[in-house]
């Protein structure tokens, strides 16, 4: 049996402000840093050790991993960093407040933009300074692979090659792996692992800074999965994520 630990980054500044973040490189809040520290302490307390860790090229995920590994006294852990683990690209929605957008377009439309499997928001124009082709960290990525928007289906297509080529072989080789990434890149991976349908994936919400453990068989099929930590706290955090795209009530 293998174990894989997945963790969404701690609360970011735009999580706090309830904005569509996507590939925008915002940092953690103090709460987010504390979540990462507590996650690392919990992993250490539960006896977890890692041979390899993986994360995206976005600082909120990288810093979450750093802080968690530091709390485990394991900063020496080798880390693989890939743009393929980035958050889903939210196109022209990036930077907009989710509740204000819901008030303008309706809760249902925002839910479609946030959670529909095959519907992407309006793309960024090619000349928009927010387009990843203007960001030096993506300079070596072929231009036709850089998204101007994505749906979850696109995110799955981006994440799975990295899973198949890097993460899964490491697990099969007996490496103990931690992945610190983002809500939607982890949803994409979980959809693959658990074979979740396109319709059912809409209801999956991943809280910030909570270690999620997958026990896998020899074929990397899930035996079971569970969050570490307080169950009531995790349920409340999931509910908060689900409510982010709703208009505020007067």
Swiss-Prot record:
The active site is at residues 9, 87. It catalyses: (2R)-2-phosphoglycerate = (2R)-3-phosphoglycerate. Substrate binds at residues 8-15, 21-22, 60, 87-90, 98, 114-115, 183-184. GO terms for biological process: gluconeogenesis; glycolytic process. Its EC number is 5.4.2.11. GO terms for molecular function: phosphoglycerate mutase activity. It is an enzyme of class 5 (isomerase). Keywords: Gluconeogenesis, Glycolysis, Isomerase. The record marks 182 as: Transition state stabilizer. Catalyzes the interconversion of 2-phosphoglycerate and 3-phosphoglycerate. Homodimer. This is 2,3-bisphosphoglycerate-dependent phosphoglycerate mutase. It comes from Bordetella petrii (strain ATCC BAA-461 / DSM 12804 / CCUG 43448).
């Amino acid at each position: 049996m293998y174990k894989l630990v997945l963790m969404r980054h701690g609360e970011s500044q735009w999580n706090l402000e309830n904005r569509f973040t996507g590939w925008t490189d915002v940092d953690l809040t103090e709460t987010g840093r504390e979540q990462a520290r507590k996650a690392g302490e919990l992993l250490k307390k539960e006896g977890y050790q890692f041979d390899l860790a993986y994360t995206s090229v976005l600082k909120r995920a990288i810093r979450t991993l750093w802080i968690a590994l530091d709390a485990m006294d394991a900063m020496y852990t080798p880390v693989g960093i890939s743009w393929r683990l980035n958050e889903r690209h939210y196109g022209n929605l990036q930077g907009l407040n989710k509740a204000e957008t819901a008030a303008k377009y309706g809760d249902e439309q925002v839910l479609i933009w946030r959670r529909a499997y095959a519907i992407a928001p309006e793309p960024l124009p090619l000349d928009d300074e927010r387009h990843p082709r203007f960001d030096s960290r993506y300079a070596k990525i072929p231009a036709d692979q850089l998204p101007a928007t994505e749906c979850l289906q696109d995110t799955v297509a981006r994440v799975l090659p990295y899973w198949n080529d890097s993460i899964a072989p490491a697990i099969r080789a007996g490496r103990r792996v931690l992945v610190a990434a983002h809500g939607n890149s982890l949803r994409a991976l979980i959809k693959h692992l658990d074979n979740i349908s396109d319709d059912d994936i809409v209801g999956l919400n991943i809280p910030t800074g909570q270690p999620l453990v997958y026990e896998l068989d020899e074929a990397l099929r899930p035996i079971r999965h569970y969050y570490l930590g307080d169950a009531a706290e995790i349920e409340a955090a999931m509910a908060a994520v689900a409510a982010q795209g709703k208009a505020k009530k007067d």
